[in-house]
């Protein structure tokens, strides 16, 4: 989704009194809560699932960019600390969010290799264990079937 905002004059905003300033969360508090810490670790099951997903991309000769690898790793480490993961559908929640936000949007191509990539990812990311990613993958598969086999995250 692309959000378009109307331009505003910054001067109009500067003189506004901020209500409830004492209730605002500081940037330092946000960093303490959501930035990776030395003691953050990725749960073994989440790491194994991530390794399996990376292997699917490697087997199809499709690269995941190093920057995205690092973002997924850090997101999963913090997510394993912060997220509730006590049901089968939420056990892999950090990876489910990271995959659907950082990796799946990079899929953009057509042909048998991409069809097999989506099929293999759907086997690994099921509606029971990674519902967000599974939903996106199913949508990509369905749209590609009606779009000459072109697989793209942002297709509608």
Predicted regions and their residues:
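C-terminal regulatory/interaction module of P-loop NTP-utilizing enzymes
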Residues: 1-156
């Amino acid at each position: 989704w692309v959000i378009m905002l109307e331009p505003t004059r910054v001067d109009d905003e500067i003189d506004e009194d901020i209500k409830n300033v004492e209730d605002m969360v500081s940037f330092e508090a946000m960093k303490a809560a959501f930035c990776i810490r030395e003691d953050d670790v990725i749960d073994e099951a989440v790491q194994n699932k991530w390794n399996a997903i990376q292997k699917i991309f490697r087997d199809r000769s499709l690269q995941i960019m190093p920057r995205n690898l690092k973002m997924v790793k850090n997101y999963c480490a913090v997510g394993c600390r912060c997220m509730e993961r006590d049901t089968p559908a939420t056990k892999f929640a950090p990876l489910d969010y990271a995959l659907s936000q950082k990796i799946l949007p990079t899929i953009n191509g057509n042909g048998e290799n991409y069809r097999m990539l989506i099929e293999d990812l759907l086997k690994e990311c099921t509606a029971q264990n990674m519902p967000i990613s599974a939903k996106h993958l199913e949508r990509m598969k369905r749209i590609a079937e009606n779009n000459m086999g072109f697989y793209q995250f942002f297709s509608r």
